[in-house]
Amino acid sequence: LEPELVTGMGTAADMENVAIESLTYKELTVTAIVTGGIETNGGRVGDPADYYKPAEKPDKLGTINIILILDMPPGTLARALVTCTEAKTAAIQELLAGSNYSTGLATGSGTDQTIIVANSDSELYFEGAGKHSKMGELIGKTVTKAVKAALSKQSGLNPKTQHNVFRR
């Protein structure tokens, strides 16, 4: 492997609990590969911070990791990342997963990571990846479904277990 062409993600999640979802519309395919667990690190954006530590890297490894594969050139990657993050947050909030640091619902963990893989040679081009576009719809559906599946596999977090108010 050429070091300048590869990347990695760290996680405490069991790789056997990975969730993979893929959707296709006409010539467009979106695939989400997700590992996840937020039972010990789930938090809400804006919660009180655990630390202020200028350093090379934090102590904890990533917990909700998403690899999003898009069959398109990298022109709309920034918006695709926003849509992916919104979908992850929607999945967590639909599961009513609480923050471990405040009384709010979690929006993720403190160490989430996302990698978007785009085909730079693709002849497909889309003007956007937001909620009003088909690309955004596919990103939203694949990521939401994969995040829910990964959290259920890794942590047992699913609508059935969250139905009991005493568990939440």
Features from the language model and the residues they span:
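A structural signal for small-residue-enriched, beta-sheet-centric alpha/beta enzyme cores
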Residues: 1-168
